[in-house]
Curated annotation (Swiss-Prot):
Region entry Disordered, spans: 13-51, 63-175, 274-307, 388-410
Region (Binds RB1 and SP1): 339-438
Chain positions with N-acetylalanine modification: A2
A Gene Ontology cellular-component term: transcription regulator complex
Gene: Aatf
Naturally occurring in which organism (per UniProt): Mus musculus
Protein name, per record: Protein AATF
InterPro entries associated with the record: AATF (IPR025160), AATF/Bfr2 (IPR039223), AATF_C (IPR012617)
One example of a Gene Ontology biological process annotation: regulation of mitotic cell cycle
Family that this chain belongs to: Belongs to the AATF family.
Compartment(s) where it occurs, according to its Swiss-Prot or TrEMBL record: Nucleus, Nucleolus
Entry keyword set: Acetylation, Nucleus, Phosphoprotein
Length: 526
């Protein structure tokens, strides 16, 4: 049936005298009305895949309502085994017990074993009442029952074996999963530690690069022999600047000492250097109890005690601190040298110098201390120290045109002779660090790996796109002249006329070329 029309539409149709136009496509019958179907069968489904009828859907419900044999409940394998073994089939007394148990727990058993035992008991009673032939039949029935019980036992044994195998497999899978998860977590932690170490090294190197400019500026300061002259001629302005710089340097030195003490105090193996206690050399590893004690101590004492030292006390204090730290430094260097040596697997191969201990090699290099100090006191950069006269350049001999220019040749090691005990210049070590940084950044990518090279190229393009170009937006539409300043002409000279012809002779020559032989004065007189 069609849906009822609203009251407003019915009233409008009644008040409108104009007859309605019937739609030829409209179908008043509901059975033949065009409808949108929910599903369209294109013949792709198989013919056997038919829908379940309503009778089959109601069949299980009706069977459960009519017969209790089809009723059941969800149970586990273990509970089913216990219930199954409780039903002993060979003896009649057990059958009677099973009958009593079946009458009490008939609703809880859903596997049909109770009905089988009842049928067997009835057959046994019938066999006792019957004749000898019947007794023979009963014996055969008893044999069949024994065979049935044996089959059930074999099935249960097979299921037990399957359960044991499943348990073993699950245990093995759990052990393997736990082992693999531990390995993966360890590798992840190692990777994070290495990443943090590389990031820390990059930050330290960045700080060293920023300190290079300050080091060059420090080397240009006036030295002690001419410093009083600068102080006298500088006046109060120089004195105030000197006082402020002294305070800033003192605060910086205290901050660096506090940072060093904080770092040494946080690590258990170096805490004795700050506390002044004896180092614990019994065990290198730290147990969980020690970690808890360390955490409690940190809560009680978050930082080492602050030291108030004067400027005169810092040299002796730093010398003592360095001597105390040397023991831990040597132990750490030797430990990691041995680990890397074992990991490389090149024991007993190579030169004899590499077979020596790392501490022996360091001591051998530090033996010539005077040479190392001279290397740091050698001026390697081009800068002028205030208060010292500028070096006078050597005069260059004049050369005539056509002769080759000769430059003055100095000794090969002239730059090494420029020694100054009041400066510290390690440009060679600084440039070595820069070279290693550039090599590490550039050689980290495999040249054959096109994907990695493409990613690097995209990163470079992204950085280039971030750079803002300086564009003069007011110079468009002719509002501003655009011009390029030409460079000055160098070695330019006007041409010199070396001809012997005078200007009058040159004029007469050109006039004769065009047929005008009269001189210009005669033309003017006419």
């Amino acid at each position: 049936m069609a849906a009822p029309q609203p009251l407003a539409l019915q009233l409008e149709q009644l008040l409108n005298p104009r007859p309605r136009e019937a739609d030829p496509e409209a179908d008043p019958e509901e059975a033949t009305r065009a409808r949108v179907i929910d599903r369209f069968d294109e013949g792709e489904e198989e013919k056997d895949d038919l829908a379940v009828s309503s009778i089959r859907k109601l069949a299980p419900v009706s069977l459960l309502d009519t017969d209790k044999r089809y009723s059941g409940k969800t149970t586990s394998r273990k509970a089913w085994k216990e219930d199954h073994w409780e039903q002993a089939l060979p003896s009649s007394s057990d059958n009677e017990a099973s009958d009593e148990g079946g009458s009490e727990d008939g609703d809880s058993e859903g596997l049909g074993l109770e009905e089988i035992s009842e049928d067997v008991d009835e057959d046994l009673e019938d066999n006792k009442i019957s004749d000898e032939g019947g007794s023979e039949d009963g014996d055969s029935e008893g044999l069949g029952l024994e065979e049935f019980s044996e089959d059930v036992e074999e099935d249960l044994e097979g299921e037990d074996e399957e359960d044991r195998e499943e348990d073993r497999n699950s245990e093995d899978d759990g052990v393997v999963a736990a082992f693999s998860s531990v390995k993966v977590s360890e590798e992840v932690e190692k990777g994070r530690a290495v990443k943090n170490q590389i990031a820390l090294w990059d930050q330290l190197l960045e700080g060293r690069i920023k300190l290079q400019k300050a080091l060059l500026t420090t080397n240009q300061l006036p030295q002690p022999d001419v410093f009083p002259v600068f102080k006298d001629k500088g006046g109060p302005e120089f004195a105030s600047a000197l006082k402020n710089s002294h305070k800033a340097l003192k605060a910086l030195l205290r901050s660096l000492v506090d940072l060093q003490e904080e770092l040494l105090f946080q690590y258990p193996d170096t805490r004795h250097i700050v506390n002044g206690a004896k180092p614990n050399t019994e065990s290198e590893e730290i147990s969980s109890e020690d970690d808890e004690l360390v955490g409690e101590k940190k809560k009680q004492r978050k930082a080492p005690p602050k030291r108030k030292l004067e400027m005169e006390d810092y040299p002796s204090f730093m010398a003592k601190r360095f001597a105390d730290f040397t023991i831990y430094r040597n132990h750490t260097l030797q430990k990691w040298h041995d680990k890397t040596k074992l990991a490389s697997g090149k024991l007993g191969k190579g030169f004899g110098a590499f077979e020596r201990s790392i501490l022996t090699q360091i001591d051998h290099i530090m033996m010539d201390k005077e040479r190392l100090l001279r290397r740091t006191q050698t001026k390697r950069s081009a800068y002028r120290v205030l208060g010292k006269p500028e070096p006078v350049p050597e005069p260059v001999a004049e050369t005539l045109p056509g002769e080759p220019e000769t430059l003055p040749q100095g000794p090969a090691n002239a730059h090494l002779r420029d020694l100054d005990e009041e400066i510290f210049d390690d440009d060679d070590f600084y440039h070595q660090l820069l070279r290693e940084l550039i090599e590490r950044k550039t050689s980290s990518l495999d040249p054959n790996d096109q994907v990695a090279m493409g990613r690097q190229w995209l990163a470079i393009q992204k950085l280039r796109s971030k750079i803002r170009k300086k564009v003069d937006r007011k110079a468009s539409k002719g509002r501003k002249l655009r011009f390029h300043v030409l460079s000055k002409l160098l070695s330019f000279m006007a041409p010199i006329d070396h001809t012997a012809m005078s200007d009058d002779a040159r004029t007469e020559l050109f006039r004769s070329l065009f047929g005008q032989l009269n001189p210009p004065d005669a033309d003017r007189g006419k």
